Regions:
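Hydrophobic alpha-helical transmembrane segments of membrane proteins
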Residues: 1-75, 93-224
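Short helix-to-coil transition segments within interhelical loops
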Residues: 82-87
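Alpha-helix N-cap/helix-start motif at helix boundaries, enriched for small hydrophobics
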Residues: 89-91
Length: 224
């Protein structure tokens, strides 16, 4: 703890919380390697960049929020309380930590994808990559955007069951266009306007994260 505290001098409150989250999750780093294994497997099977990105977003949404479980299991509230930051900075720092997990995973996935493309001497389509990133960010934001306020309000143990709901919601949204013909036009639009659809996904994701953050702050303030 003293080692970590010394390394965080001069940082902003948000950066301190983000750094502390990474410090605590360092022991879980090996579990993230399973994402690389999954992406390699899917890549060898010839999966598209969209499938790879969405798989990564799903995985990170599942793994990154484990910080709440570790904090609760190891009674680390006192450690977080010792950091001189505001409640808003605690929440924003946690959101930043989770987002950086997603961002890093997307960088790794794109590098692996480009590696597959080069090995096969194929060509890659930038709009396809943009569409994959846009959809993956929407999946990630929808899941974590619902989960995070619940964890801040109820704690990991009490919210664990409720945290499954966003995964079910995302699965429903993914399969719904296949069964509802009226929604199939969305898929057609996405394929014919990849850049525009990707931008719409990113914009929607940012709105979800913004609203989620403010709800989480309200919930966390009431808990304190």
């Amino acid at each position: 703890y003293l080692h970590w505290q010394g390394r965080c001098k001069g940082m902003t409150g948000v950066a301190r919380i983000t750094k502390l989250d990474f410090f605590i999750m360092k022991s879980q780093g090996i579990s993230y390697l399973s994402l690389v294994a999954v992406i390699l497997l899917f890549g060898l099977m010839g999966s598209s960049i969209t499938v790879l990105c969405i798989t990564g977003a799903w995985f990170i949404a599942l793994m990154a929020t484990n910080i709440f479980a570790i904090q609760e299991k190891n009674h680390l509230d006192r450690l977080y309380g010792s950091v001189c930051v505001s409640l808003n900075e605690v929440v924003l720092g946690r959101y930043t930590f989770v987002f950086l997990n997603y961002f890093t995973s997307m960088v790794v996935i794109i590098i692996l994808y480009l590696g597959f493309v080069l090995c096969r001497k194929a060509t890659f389509d930038v709009p396809d990559i943009m569409l994959g990133l846009g959809l993956s960010f929407l999946v990630f934001s929808t899941i974590t955007g619902i989960q995070m306020p619940l964890f801040f309000k109820m704690g990991y143990t009490k919210a664990k069951l409720w945290s499954v709901i966003p995964f079910a919601v995302v699965m429903l949204l993914v399969v719904l266009p296949s069964f509802v013909s009226a929604l199939s036009g969305i898929l057609d639009f996405a394929q014919s306007h990849k850049e525009l659809f990707a931008f719409a996904c990113i914009l929607t994701s940012c709105i979800i994260q913004f609203v989620s953050y403010h709800i989480a702050v309200i919930f966390y303030r009431k808990q304190r």
